[in-house]
């Protein structure tokens, strides 16, 4: 493979991975701006509707150290296709469901695959370039994380308020389906080259710095999600602003993030 061809392949890979991370984060974070709409659509209280965010986040927290480990020896393309397929199917079901319990299930199942896809996206980006360029490659993928918060939340809020909750779920489905097809047809097979034993991988859990990092991430995200999840309901209840204004405020908040 020539250098120019390899560079084109890497650019395409980075684009697909970045868009994939955006789709995954968009599915996770997009609903935080439409909690009141979910409550109204499914006839539940706002705190109950908040479980669409809390349940997703809790499952990620507990599955993140385990699920990537279980799939660490499987072809990376296969794993990404599996994760994206779960997201597409779950999002598609959420488009049509009128049952709140079913909605929670469609939120819970893909949450297990969230850390799986995101971890592979970051590691694949880093390993696809030289060691010197790895930080730059990872930063590109992280743009998908930022976009999920900066664009995903306000866009979802706007779509749900102007059309319907189902329309917002269609948005989730289309983004993830596009990435799924791009992954299937444009990304080559990526077998795992270095297969570490599960014991070797688990040994990292003995490092205090890891648990300190876990705690810091837990506290930061708990504060952010706690504020972010109920911001729209607070603004509607206290200030009586429209969802168009809320979408703009969510965009500003996402930019600050």
Residue ranges and their predicted role:
Residues 90, 101-109:
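Paired small-residue
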